[in-house]
């Protein structure tokens, strides 16, 4: 198994600057100051994305058709559903408006956006909607038209392209309306081509994700500074949302997880409504969205500015070691599955050291699946326009002998195994989110082969820890990585709790 580096002290937090300032403070952490202001990002590179997708399709002719999300009412109500743009449409348009569609003519390299027809009543009630002239100014497109032109334009394209021309769509349910008898509708080719493009982020996409992480960092810090005065998980969720919205991020990338005590052992806990009194840790998994790009950040922290006990401090240090050891090894060409193995190896050696594991070698314990009782999910996932973003292949893969150990993923939320063995590539953004959870239901359903390696008397001392997870968003580079996430961990995290309330003595 070998040995793994130990980590001490607080991690170094990089200084970053965009839409505000970030400054180191005397406590060893940093202060982030963001203001709402007009975005200074360049136009979303929709045309470049369309060209990349066409190159993946590898055909000299054809028409790509993508439907945007439509405005809709709630069932039996006159209230609209919360709008969320279709991510494939956004990737090739950069448009976050309802009721739009697009076409891209591969041969002529022409990207056309179709916007909602003018509706005076809607304009009066809801305000101005996107029109063709405004769309041309705002977006990286060649032409903008009203929706009323769409069907006729496609018919004209089909007539000019000849018999057997192809229209590429994502799904059969998202074909353009109308009768196109001489056109072949292909709903198999476009999605994998777009997935292959989306997995490698360009600089514009990366900058959106950097900023989403900046907002999330500010929100996590606000929670730390206020946690001493909070009495319920709901206040944690409310504080995080308040900071994000105040900084212009009105949407979350996923539902906030504010899990205290034993609730932190539930991976996707969502109630966020229990009192904090008597709990050791809070696991806050929450990430803002910026221009449809996700962040995914998890921090676990005590309710006061000191560790609640030896057991809690040991588990936190072990998870931090797991995470930082894996992050340090990230670069192009690394197999992500190897990092997942590494995280389990560190957990096993740590549990042997503190007495939770017994009776067997580290390799025997690993093969029994005992470590998966405490770390039941994958090390991470792709992130981008979706929090669990797309890719042609999973970042997990089979082992070199063509098999995948079943113990690795006995309880994963998303099945990560595929027949291929991909490695990390420059431009990918992945999460690294190891965790250790003391789940009573998992232990109650453990197999005898697992239980023989576990000292349940020792485990009882750790049950109050609940769960610890630490998660950052990592950009893969040619020679290493860039950590997009700067929310404080370790001692720097405790310093922020201390700053929030003088009664929280370290």
Curated annotation (Swiss-Prot):
Binds 2 manganese ions per subunit. One of its GO terms (molecular function) is manganese ion binding. The keyword Chloroplast does not apply. SUPFAM superfamilies: Creatinase/aminopeptidase, Creatinase/prolidase N-terminal domain. GO terms for biological process: proteolysis. Keywords: Aminopeptidase, Hydrolase, Manganese, Metal-binding, Metalloprotease, Protease. Mn(2+) 1 binds at residues 296, 433, 471. SMART domains: AMP_N. Catalyzes the removal of a penultimate prolyl residue from the N-termini of peptides. This is Probable Xaa-Pro aminopeptidase PADG_06815. The lineage of its organism: Eukaryota, Fungi, Dikarya, Ascomycota, Pezizomycotina.
């Amino acid at each position: 198994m070998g040995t793994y580096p130990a980590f001490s002290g607080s991690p170094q937090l990089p200084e970053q600057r965009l839409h505000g300032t970030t400054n180191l403070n005397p406590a060893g952490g940093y202060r982030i100051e963001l203001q709402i202001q007009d975005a200074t990002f360049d136009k979303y590179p929709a045309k470049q994305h369309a060209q990349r997708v066409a190159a993946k399709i590898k055909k000299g002719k054809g028409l790509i058709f993508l439907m945007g999300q439509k405005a809709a009412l709630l069932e039996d109500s006159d209230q609209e559903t919360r709008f969320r743009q279709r991510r494939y449409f956004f990737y090739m348009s950069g448009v976050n408006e309802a009721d739009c569609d697009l076409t891209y003519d591969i041969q002529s390299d022409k990207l056309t956006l179709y916007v909602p027809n003018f509706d005076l009543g809607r304009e009066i009630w809801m305000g101005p909607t996107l029109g063709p002239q405004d769309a041309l100014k705002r977006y990286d497109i060649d032409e903008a038209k009203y929706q009323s032109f769409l069907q006729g334009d496609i018919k004209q394209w089909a007539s000019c392209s000849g018999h057997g021309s192809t229209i590429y769509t994502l799904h059969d349910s998202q074909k353009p309306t109308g009768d196109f008898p001489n056109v072949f509708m292909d709903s198999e080719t476009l999605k994998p081509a777009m997935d292959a493009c989306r997995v490698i982020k360009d600089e514009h996409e990366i900058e959106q994700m950097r900023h989403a992480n900046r907002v999330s960092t500010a929100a996590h810090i606000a929670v730390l500074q206020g946690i001493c005065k909070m009495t319920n998980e709901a206040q944690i969720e409310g504080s995080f949302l308040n900071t994000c919205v105040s900084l212009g991020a009105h949407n979350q990338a996923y539902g906030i997880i504010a899990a205290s005590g034993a609730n932190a052992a539930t991976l996707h806990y969502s109630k966020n409504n229990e009192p904090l009194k008597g709990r050791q840790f809070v696991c806050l998994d929450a990430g803002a969205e910026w221009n449809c790009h996700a962040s995914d950040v998890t921090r676990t922290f005590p309710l006061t500015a000191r560790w609640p006990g030896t057991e809690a401090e040991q588990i936190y240090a072990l998870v931090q070691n797991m995470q930082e050891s894996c992050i340090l090894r990230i670069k192009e060409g690394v197999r992500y599955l190897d990092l997942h193995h590494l995280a389990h190896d560190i957990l096993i050696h740590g549990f042997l050291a503190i007495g939770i594991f017994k009776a067997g070698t580290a390799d025997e314990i690993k093969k029994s699946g005992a470590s998966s009782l405490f770390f039941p999910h994958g090390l991470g996932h792709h992130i981008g326009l979706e929090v669990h973003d797309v890719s042609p292949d999973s970042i997990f893969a089979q082992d070199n002998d063509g098999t995948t150990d079943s113990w690795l993923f006995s309880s994963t939320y998303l099945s990560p195994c595929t027949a291929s063995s991909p490695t990390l590539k420059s431009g990918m953004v992945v999460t690294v989110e190891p965790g250790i959870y003391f789940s009573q239901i998992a232990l109650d359903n453990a197999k005898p082969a697992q239980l023989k390696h576990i000292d349940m008397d020792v485990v009882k001392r750790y049950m109050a820890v609940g769960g610890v997870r630490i998660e950052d968003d990592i950009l893969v580079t040619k020679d290493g990585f860039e950590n997009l996430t700067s929310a404080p961990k370790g001692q720097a995290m405790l310093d922020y709790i201390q700053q929030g309330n003088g009664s929280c003595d370290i």
